[in-house]
Structures are given as C-alpha cells and as structure tokens.
A protein has these predicted regions:
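N-terminal secretory/targeting leader peptides
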Residues: 23-112, 128-333
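Sec/Tat signal peptide C-region and signal peptidase I cleavage site
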Residues: 16-22
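Positively charged n-region of N-terminal signal peptides that target proteins for export
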Residues: 1-5
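Signature of the catalytic double-stranded beta-helix
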Residues: 114-126
Length: 333
C-alpha cells in the first residue's frame, strides 16, 4: 500500500506533462519553388511531420529569397535559419575536402562517379559532421559544360572570354587558373544579370541547372565536353539537430537521405532531356575541333587538379584515395 501514493503521483505527472515543443527546421535553397528538388523535399517534410507526430517540421525558403550561400550561412550562424541546400563550394570554409568530386575532368562518365562516391561519400559527410554540419546527402546536379555567348571550342577560345566562377570559392579559382583562364567571380544569384549585361560571357553549369536558373536564355553555344562534376549538400546545424531525440533524428536521416538520393536519380534521368531542351532553344553544340585541341583540354584538367591539390583546396591524401578507386574501377572494365 505504501507504493500507492507514488503510483498516483506518477499518473498525475504524466497526465499534466507538457508535450515536447515542435522543432521547426528552416531550410534555404536557391532551387526554384516549382522544381523537382522542392517537390521531393516537401514530400519528405510531410512524411517526417507525420511520423514524428509533429515534433519535427520543415519550412523551406526556395528561389534564393534568403540570399546567396554566404548570406545563408550567416543566417544559420545567427539562428535565423537552421540549414540549407548549399553548393559544396560554400562549405569549403568548414571542410575543404568536400569539393573532392569537383576536381576538373577527373571523371569520364557517371559510372566512374558512382564507383568513387560509394567509397568516399561517407568520408566527406563525416568530415562535415566534425565541423558541425549534419548532412542528409550529396545531391547530384550533374556534369558541368561550358556555355557561352560567343563560340568557343578550344582552351585558347576560353581564355579570350569573360568566364564566371562562384564568388569566394578558392577551389574554383585554383581550378580555372589551372586552365590559364582569368575569371570573373559573381554570386550565383548575380549570374543571370551578369550574362544579360555582358559582365560575363561564359559559364560552366550542368544542363539541368542552366534550365532551372534561366541561364540558357543568355547563351548561344555549349561545348560538349564534361568539365567537372557538380553537386550540393542538404545540411543542418548539428547543434539544432542534436536537440531532436534519437528516434526523430533517425526518421529525419532516413527520409531526407532517401529523398536526396531520388533527387540524384531524377537529375540523372533528366540529363539527356535537358540537352535536348537546350538544343530546341537554339543553342548550338560545339566540340573540340581536333585531337590536339581535346588533348589541350585534358592537359588543362590535369593542371587544374594539380593546382587545386597544391593550393590545399583538396588534400593529396583524399585525392589519392579517390584516384586509387578510379584506377581499380577502370582496370576492371
């Protein structure tokens, strides 16, 4: 009978306990509101809200309304946002090796990308986690191609044009200097205006990105030569994520990881359709005119990779690991 008052007290406490306050994760992205990226993210957010019984909710700010990557990171630091879908260039200030797959002309095709990513994605995600970022996946934008207002199919042509690189991206600067090109840095949000005003004449961008960001409206030519692999990351401030209970964390990781994998699959399926769409818009496809011109691009890629490694943009150790995977994959084909 002595235990009865304790049992009654426990029941009363349970009855009047205040439920855990919902955690709303405010996420910024440059992706347009009507993009497949946003559709999949919203579907994932709805599933998470249901499975966590409202304890975890997402609110998205698409279309760059929160500013460029630098502005978004500042807002995360000031707790105005809890996370973002960011280009890997924006995350290099925390972990430089996150741009490993950006090394120019490292991959010949998507099968090679998949072989290396299967081995090293966990390493890159762990590196960001150590710097305070929870990563739900690395989302593929695809191979970037040079698109320009004036025709250009050789490195010499590119060196005469005003070529864009992302602002405050040391890795991109080292890479393009390896090709012997002097770039014009701009934020992604300013690229369309830069093309319209002739501040820049050429960009390197995946076809799906050129369509989504409307850059295709200001270019006339595409060099059909994949220059680098482009991807981003869906990240959340680890301090915020750690406030969720373990079960809710597992749900968020599962759902958003799955959705981001689907984004990569959709972007890859859309790759051919995007090329066709660019052609239908009147963009002319170019190719290196001869073997010597192609060899010059390949050598430029090698020099650009070396420059990125020498500058510390990517560690030699991780590059060698990626290269070992590539060589093993190629030898097995």
């Amino acid at each position: 009978m002595a235990l009865r008052p304790i049992a009654i007290l426990a029941c009363l406490l349970a009855a009047f306990a205040v439920p855990a306050e919902a955690e709303t994760l405010k996420i910024a992205t440059i992706s347009p509101a009507n993009s497949s990226w946003m559709r999949l993210m919203r579907e994932g957010a709805d599933e998470i809200a249901e499975r966590t019984e409202g304890r975890v909710e997402f609110k998205f700010y698409p279309g760059g309304v929160m500013g460029d990557d630098a502005a978004v990171i500042r807002k995360i630091r000031f707790r105005q946002l809890q996370g973002a879908a960011l280009t890997v260039g924006a995350l290099t200030q925390f972990y430089t090796d996150i741009q490993l797959y950006n090394l120019p002309m490292m991959f010949r095709d998507y099968d090679e990308v998949d072989a290396v990513r299967a081995e090293l994605d966990p390493v890159l995600e762990a590196g960001l986690a150590e710097e305070g970022w929870v990563v739900f996946g690395l989302g593929e934008a695809g191979f970037a191609y040079a698109m320009s207002k004036r025709p250009g199919s050789t490195i010499e042509d590119a060196r005469t044009q005003k070529v864009w690189i992302p602002a405050d991206d040391a890795g991109a600067l080292a890479a393009i200097e390896g090709f012997g090109i002097t770039p014009v840095p701009l934020s992604v949000a300013d690229v369309l205006t830069g093309l319209q005003t002739d501040l820049i004449e050429a960009v390197a961008v995946p076809p799906v990105g050129a369509l989504a960001l409307q850059w295709y409206t200001q270019v006339n030519y595409l060099l059909d030569l994949p220059l680098m692999y482009v991807y981003g990351a869906l990240t959340v401030d680890r301090n915020v994520f750690d406030r969720l209970d373990a079960g809710d964390q597992a749900i968020v990781r599962e759902v958003m990881g799955r959705q981001f994998a689907e984004i990569t699959a959709i972007n890859r399926r859309d790759h051919s359709a995007a090329f066709e769409a660019l052609g239908n818009q009147g963009i002319e496809f170019l190719a290196p005119p001869d073997d010597a011109s192609l060899a010059a691009w390949v050598e430029g890629g090698r020099a650009a990779r070396a420059r990125m490694i020498e500058s510390g943009a990517v560690s030699a150790e991780l590059f060698l690991r990626a290269n070992d995977v590539l060589e093993a994959y190629r030898a097995a084909q």
